[in-house]
Design a protein with these regions (language model features):
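Bacterial carbohydrate/catabolite-sensing allosteric modules
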Residues: 2-3, 9-22, 34, 38-46, ...
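Short acidic, S/G/P-rich loop/turn micro-motifs used as interaction or catalytic elements
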Residues: 30-31
């Protein structure tokens, strides 16, 4: 179950009534969630993008480093005004966004940052909010692909072209990413391997195969596609205006 599900009465009833030997938690965990886990369960394994400061078995793909990679990709392509769409509290991807800007002596403007749930709906609303602020962003970093999908729809509905007017990059590399138009540039997270490794570690813990907490950090890579190409020196609109001027001369 996810960190969101854990406090639901039905979830608690399900795992206690069935005498669960161990649990796997997906996603972010706050202190309240950790206290709950410590109280009721001996064998706990966590998998996600945010490293936990706790003595539990963990299989992660470092969301902080993945965000740095995504941001460094955009900055390397010439973007200096980069928007953020996603969650900002207890979120390593937001921390990575800010750290990447700081490393390049760029300030994360508040108007560039939109705090929304990580979902297609959240991305859609987040992009509409960002665009309504009339910022001068040239690229947007979305916390995950579902958020990016919603954001891309809102950007297109606003009459903007991706990537000519606005580049988009995200994290996950779900199957849908390569079938979008344009195809989504994203950081590939080895979700299947993370799940398999977490299950193996939890079973080993239940069978008393190990007692010391294990932390495994799996690698990611950039799936470089169409939504984030090198930035042109001139925008299509500017080039169009120059063409008209030459014709008038």
């Amino acid at each position: 179950f996810t960190a969101i599900d854990i406090h639901h009465p039905n979830t608690f009833r399900l795992i206690t009534d069935n005498h669960v030997d161990g649990v796997v938690v997906l996603g972010r965990c706050d202190k309240q969630t950790l206290s709950f886990l410590k109280k009721y369960f001996n064998c706990v394994a966590y998998t996600g993008l945010n490293l936990l400061e706790a003595k539990y078995d963990q299989v992660i793909c470092d969301g902080y480093q993945a965000s740095l990679a995504a941001m460094n990709t955009l900055i390397g392509l010439g973007h200096t005004r980069i928007g953020f769409i996603g969650e900002t509290q207890f979120e390593d991807r937001y921390t990575g966004y800010c750290a990447a800007l700081s490393a390049h002596n760029l300030r994360p403007a508040k108007s560039y940052i939109v705090n929304v749930p990580l979902s297609s709906e959240g991305g859609y609303k987040g992009a509409k909010e960002l665009l309504s602020r009339k910022t001068d962003v040239s690229a947007v970093f979305c916390c995950n692909d579902n958020t990016a999908i919603g954001a891309m729809r809102a950007i297109k509905e606003a009459g903007l072209a991706i990537p000519d007017d606005l580049s988009v990059i995200s994290i996950d590399d779900i199957d849908t990413a390569q079938y979008l138009s344009p195809m989504l540039t994203t950081i590939h997270i080895p979700v299947e391997e993370m799940g398999q490794m977490t299950a193996k570690i939890l079973i080993d813990r239940i069978e008393e195969g190990h007692k010391v907490p294990i932390k495994i950090n799996l690698p990611f890579y950039l799936a470089n596609r169409e939504s984030s190409p090198p930035r042109s020196e001139k925008t299509p609109a500017a080039e169009h205006e120059q063409t008209i001027s030459r014709k008038e001369e």
